[in-house]
Amino acid sequence: MKRSLRKMWRPGEKKEPQGVVYEDVPDDTEDFKESLKVVFEGSAYGLQNFNKQKKLKRCDDMDTFFLHYAAAEGQIELMEKITRDSSLEVLHEMDDYGNTPLHCAVEKNQIESVKFLLSRGANPNLRNFNMMAPLHIAVQGMNNEVMKVLLEHRTIDVNLEGENGNTAVIIACTTNNSEALQILLKKGAKPCKSNKWGCFPIHQAAFSGSKECMEIILRFGEEHGYSRQLHINFMNNGKATPLHLAVQNGDLEMIKMCLDNGAQIDPVEKGRCTAIHFAATQGATEIVKLMISSYSGSVDIVNTTDGCHETMLHRASLFDHHELADYLISVGADINKIDSEGRSPLILATASASWNIVNLLLSKGAQVDIKDNFGRNFLHLTVQQPYGLKNLRPEFMQMQQIKELVMDEDNDGCTPLHYACRQGGPGSVNNLLGFNVSIHSKSKDKKSPLHFAASYGRINTCQRLLQDISDTRLLNEGDLHGMTPLHLAAKNGHDKVVQLLLKKGALFLSDHNGWTALHHASMGGYTQTMKVILDTNLKCTDRLDEDGNTALHFAAREGHAKAVALLLSHNADIVLNKQQASFLHLALHNKRKEVVLTIIRSKRWDECLKIFSHNSPGNKCPITEMIEYLPECMKVLLDFCMLHSTEDKSCRDYYIEYNFKYLQCPLEFTKKTPTQDVIYEPLTALNAMVQNNRIELLNHPVCKEYLLMKWLAYGFRAHMMNLGSYCLGLIPMTILVVNIKPGMAFNSTGIINETSDHSEILDTTNSYLIKTCMILVFLSSIFGYCKEAGQIFQQKRNYFMDISNVLEWIIYTTGIIFVLPLFVEIPAHLQWQCGAIAVYFYWMNFLLYLQRFENCGIFIVMLEVILKTLLRSTVVFIFLLLAFGLSFYILLNLQDPFSSPLLSIIQTFSMMLGDINYRESFLEPYLRNELAHPVLSFAQLVSFTIFVPIVLMNLLIGLAVGDIAEVQKHASLKRIAMQVELHTSLEKKLPLWFLRKVDQKSTIVYPNKPRSGGMLFHIFCFLFCTGEIRQEIPNADKSLEMEILKQKYRLKDLTFLLEKQHELIKLIIQKMEIISETEDDDSHCSFQDRFKKEQMEQRNSRWNTVLRAVKAKTHHLEP
């Protein structure tokens, strides 16, 4: 309530009422404005009348709010009224910032309000959300009279800690409130109490430049036994003295005051820096002079070191404070002092590009042969900087000591010329070469300066190095790894450097790994560099490394699609490496999608597809590997196998040609003898799709048409023949069961003998039919035995993994036993039991034959899944049957269905299916008083009803529904997998001549015409298809792709044009003798590197300096 009212009344804000407006409801906003007006007018009587008239419901909240404003405005009468009508807690209520009324009064310097609030019991030690107590606010705001009133209160804590542990004394020193500091010290405030950083009041006074406060603190400490020298050298948690903080502030008068009071210069803080090091870092020459002149110790303060063993001269050199450096040298600073990294001031200044200091030190005779921990001298670091040796005065370049450094090597064996070539400063390179430096000098890894220049793309430097050579030894020298400058330039994509080296006579050599320059360029995907190399030497595309890899292998493995396309267009040879992998295998195994798509779209796709080893275990046919690793690329390949005619899609003559060349290997491979241990299954691609669950590929129109072609060619006929042979046993067996009365035996004389004592004469009209059926059942069973034996010979171990084969053996065995009385006499009961088993499994196995048909096959699959779920839950069924069956046997054993344990369990199973038979088993025996234990019997019935019909059955239904949903989700995969399995098994059995006759490489389909196929095709459509035979894939919209391609070529043309203009402008600059920064910019980056660099940082064009130079020259030439 309070916060909403405060937000509502702010200067300059006028808010309109929003939302729903209620009529006949008093407006609190107007009441608040009126009450606030009373506060500012200072009328207690008016506020009292207002409260009586309005009858505010939240009087305490309103009074708390008003008390803050009344205290800030000094309205004592209102404060009396509010505090009289409220509890004591109103004095300690806080606003949004944690301020109490006392805070508000102190902040506004309302002395009377402070006295009134303290007299009413306000706590002066409460802190707001910024950890500021009223005393802190008074000291900080220079409200010393209010502070005096607060200090007179008996409960005031004069040493109370505020924000960051600062006491009122520290705050007084921060604000230079000397009057408040004196009063606080008189009231017992402790000047030795530090804050959370360990800073005492004297530290804060030194940092804030509060000279009066520092004098008061020092005098107070001196009066209490602390000498000024001891006090002025107190340290905080960072071991910093007041002098350190005074130097950080840069107040010369405060520093002088610290020194006059005995501040020591040599103490070091945690960073091992003295106060004078701080001054040297800031370049404060006057402060350094003051501190050096006032130092009277025995230590050489000018050359004292910090934690890094750096002197003041090192610090001045780091930030190019040349005036301070000149003064330090004049007072005896050691110009050759070494820090912890072995750097002298000269080396440190050179590394920091402090050229004023560098020239100063050289003029003072600094040693130039000192090396840092990396073995670099001053000249190594000089050539690394922009403009290099141009930053030094000309007379220094003539010094013999500097000339002797040009062949000096660092820890890696690199001379200054190596550094200059790596940095790309043509001016520095020219100066160094002017000292007769050998361009054949090698580093420890056998790299010459040309290696560095080529590696970093310094084309101007390369031109300068190759300008005066008389042989090509420098061009073709290899480093420690056998890499020539050509290798390094190609590896980093510097196409212009590669072109220069080739023009100068660089050879296409291989490094120690067998990699050529083309290998390195293809690994990085630098197509421009590759074009330069290929334009010079076309045969280098077929060079192999030690592992048998070509440049194609490298580009494909790294995923550089454009590089692969370039090599293929230049007729690069497609070979296998020592691991029997082609470049297509490497792209597939590394899942380089763009590379594979590029290969598919290339003119050499068929050639790439054929290159693989049949004996390689890890690098199989590219089609199967594509299905396994990159199915989306296989989908693109299948899209290319659909050729649409040029007619309109609505035209009757519109057709689609489906090409099946990628879905099955040649028939010869599937019929090979296992002499070479290379045998391919039929439908290799489709089987791979099934194994890897590639449902999106199996549902592709090309795959569907391929299966349809196989089905119409031989699948339907073969399956109908198989089904017909099975029906030769199924139908006669069914006729026998229907026409022969169970319990009667048929003998060879044609007499049916009843199992009872009397006999009947066989009806002669049916005897011949029964004999014929028995003979057919017998013959079909014998034929089934032969078929199963053949399958055992063909499938071997896999035959015993299929449970349907067990059903076949049971069917044929029980069928023969059932018709065996045709030849010999057998007991009638055995005959009819086998007949019951045979006819049961005959019809159950018939369902498995119907799996091949889509219309009913999916439901049979669902039945199998539900059956598996039931079998998994059999354990729960068994225990429940035993529990309730044995319990009912004890309670209901007088009834026939529960008279034995076995009968009781069977009856319980029947009850589980819903046949509870409550009336006969429970109600009537209870009414006749025949239940031995009625209460327990009914309790057990209720428990059985809850557990079995309700809980268990619902559980099974839920599992079945879940399984059905899962089956429906993968119905297409299962359906097509069955078709693939059928055709695979059939092709294994069919002869090669037949397959050649019926197999088709492609087929043409007219979507707008009815398919021809006669009765056979229509029967197939009725039994096999549930919906549309095919789903067309719409033609991809090529317009966007074509526009992007056009823009790509336009950008290439613009890039070429800009490069020409770039070269032209450089020539103009040279002719006009304009000097600009671009002359020292010897960098050549590939497009990829430039793009990455532009993404990381945005900077102005380097031609801005050229334009400025042109304008300056123009102004100079004007009269």
UniProtKB/Swiss-Prot annotation:
Site (Key residue for activation by the scorpion wasabi receptor toxin): P622
Residues at the site labelled Essential for electrophile activation. Sensor for electrophilic agents: C621
Residue windows of the ANK repeats: 62-92, 97-126, 130-160, 164-193, 197-226, 238-267, 271-301, 308-337, 341-370, 374-403, 412-441, 445-474, 481-510, 513-542, 547-576, 579-609
InterPro entries registered for this protein in UniProt: Ankyrin_rpt, Ankyrin_rpt-contain_sf, Ion_trans_dom, TRP_cation_channel
Membrane topology term: Multi-pass membrane protein
Coiled-coil residues: 1042-1071
Impact reported for F944A: Loss of inhibition by A-967079, AP-18, and ASD. Weak or no change in activation by cinnamaldehyde, AITC and acrolein
Segments passing through the bilayer: 719-739, 768-793, 799-823, 830-850, 863-892, 934-960
Reported effect, C665 to A/L/S: Decrease in electrophile-evoked and hyperoxia response. Does not affect covalent agonist BITC electrophile-evoked
Annotated site, Important residue for activation by the scorpion wasabi receptor toxin, chain positions: M634, T646
Description of activity control: Electrophilic ligands activate the channel by covalent modification of intracellular cysteines; Cys-621 plays a key role in covalent binding of electrophiles. Extracellular Ca(2+) both potentiates and inactivates TRPA1; a rapid potentiation follows by slow desensitization. Activated by increase in intracellular Ca(2+) concentration. Inhibited by the potent blocker of TRPV channels ruthenium red, A-967079, AP-18, HC-030031, and aryl sulfonamide derivative (S)-N-(4-chlorobenzyl)-1-((4-fluorophenyl)sulfonyl)pyrrolidine-2-carboxamide (ASD).
Positions bearing the site annotation: Crucial for calcium permeation: D915
Intramembrane segments: 902-922
PTM notes: TRPA1 activation by electrophiles occurs though covalent modification of specific cysteine residues in the N-terminal cytoplasmic domain.
A single Gene Ontology CC term: axon
Topological region Extracellular: 740-767, 824-829, 893-901, 923-933
Major subcellular site: membrane
Glycosylation site residues: N747, N753
4-hydroxyproline PTM sites in chain numbering: P394
Outcome after substituting T646P: Loss of activation by the scorpion wasabi receptor toxin
Keywords: ANK repeat, Calcium, Calcium channel, Calcium transport, Cell membrane, Coiled coil, Disease variant, Disulfide bond, Glycoprotein, Hydroxylation, Ion channel, Ion transport, Membrane, Oxidation, Repeat, Sensory transduction, Transmembrane, Transmembrane helix, Transport
Catalytic reaction list: Ca(2+)(in) = Ca(2+)(out); Mg(2+)(in) = Mg(2+)(out); Na(+)(in) = Na(+)(out); K(+)(in) = K(+)(out)
Pathology noted in the entry: Episodic pain syndrome, familial, 1: An autosomal dominant neurologic disorder characterized by onset in infancy of episodic debilitating upper body pain triggered by fasting, cold, and physical stress. The period of intense pain is accompanied by breathing difficulties, tachycardia, sweating, generalized pallor, peribuccal cyanosis, and stiffness of the abdominal wall. Affected individuals do not manifest altered pain sensitivity outside the episodes.
Description of how the protein assembles with itself and partners: Homotetramer. Interacts with TMEM100. Interacts with EGLN1. Interacts with the scorpion wasabi receptor toxin at the same site that electrophiles but in a non-covalent manner.
Protein name, UniProt field: Transient receptor potential cation channel subfamily A member 1
Protein species of origin: Homo sapiens (Human)
Gene name, Swiss-Prot/TrEMBL: TRPA1
